[in-house]
Amino acid sequence: MTHDPQKDEFTVSVENLQGKHVLPPQHFDYICVASGHYSTPNFPEYPGIETFPGRVLHSHEFRNSLEFSGQKVLLVGSSYSGEDIAAQAIKFGAKEAIVCYRSVPTGLPWPKNIIEKPLLTHIERKTIHFSDNTQIDEVDSIIFCTGYIGHFPFMQDSLRHRSANSFYPPDLYKGVLYTQGGNNKVLYLGRQDVAYTFTMFDVQAFWTAKYILGDIELPKNEEMETNWKSWHER
């Protein structure tokens, strides 16, 4: 997808997986990016991870709790996926699940075989070290429950939104309108990392439709930047 600032129009080319064009280029006045951000896993790097002899995967790849039966499993990340997978692993026979949190413990009434540990610092083969100077030995598998990253390789570089997942990502007025290029005609839907996902999708879709139809008048660029920054910094 490219933008011609002189014509103020976008050109979209579609290819199949073999890199062959399957449709002639199409031209548009607005671009709505609604491909989501739950497809490219976020894999943080930890010293010594390459020495770990067991299985390492992301929650995106998790399919069957029975695969971890009889194992001691470390879950890096204590949000929704970490909580769910820990409970499922224990329910279906895991020996122990260690949930590693980044800032504060969840405080949940876990089953007896689930324990919480603070930030992971480094790994020495099957021994995991934590920020409170404790360690856990003989870990069999590590599951990263560390979210996803926005990945939009199909967008022109100047129009590609770059941000870690957050409640209110930068550069998006009203959480939708990209303010750094495209003459205020590029909109990203669903970039927020929130609990009420589908309700948010509906609201963003309504706002986007009204904006494209001309029912919403934008403030000056400086005001839009001030607006999204005030939300992003909360």
Located regions from the model:
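Flavin (primarily FAD) cofactor-binding/catalytic cores of flavoenzymes
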Residues: 1-225
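Mid-to-C-terminal Rossmann-like scaffold of FAD/NAD(P)H-dependent oxidoreductases
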Residues: 223-234
